[in-house]
Amino acid sequence: MLELKNISFKRDNKQILDNVSLKLDDDKFVVITGPNGSGKSTLAKIIMGIEKPDSGQILLDGKDITNLPINERAKSGIGFAFHQPVRFKGITVFDLIKLSAGKDINKGEACNILSKVGLCANEYVDREISSALSGGELKRIEIASVAVRNSKVTVFDEPEAGIDLWSFNNLIKVFTDMRQSLKGTTIIISHQEKIINIADDLILLADGKVEKMGSKEEMFDKVQKDRACCKLEGGNN
């Protein structure tokens, strides 16, 4: 279980996160959503270890990982995909997946991972990770490199960024398939409705605080009730 206790973070004297506390159970598909500037991506970076909170604790299975650097945090079981996938000149897709796995794997195993993210493995396994690949292709390759680690917690920061509609629809299929064979906790930072629809749990951030959180069904019920109340109030005016 991943637990955040009273996480606060400032940048340039502006409060980005304000006393955020969360408990994320194992084997859950969690979407953190909210308006632009709500602190979503900063929270992802703090979980990853890219940013360090000004105060608060981060616990993974009861162990305090708050002060662990990004490489040690990865070793402890935190996997992540960047907002924009990184291109590595001279490195093939197979090289990246092998490095990400942290162990010796063969091309057959790499091809199996690529197939799970919707790529024709034989066409991609030996390709160089370069500008010749589209944003959607890079995104799926990065997801494959994250999936091969079998991390306890995997964080995706706005995976829909920079890809076209066709690639986005393929991405939804990849995440839907991942959810069905879920091992560990998957956290996705997104405000896309199609991604929200495949979540187990939703967390809504606003102005750096947790405004609402719960199961997808609970959250949708709250939204519908809020809308109904607004209509009643409007009708009484």
Summary of predicted features, one role per range:
Residues G56-K63, E109:
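Conserved ABC transporter NBD signature motif
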Residues E158-P159:
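Walker B catalytic motif
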Residues T33-P35:
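The feature captures the beta-strand-to-loop junction immediately N-terminal to the Walker
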Residues L2, I16-N19:
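Conserved structural motif at the start of ABC-family nucleotide-binding domains
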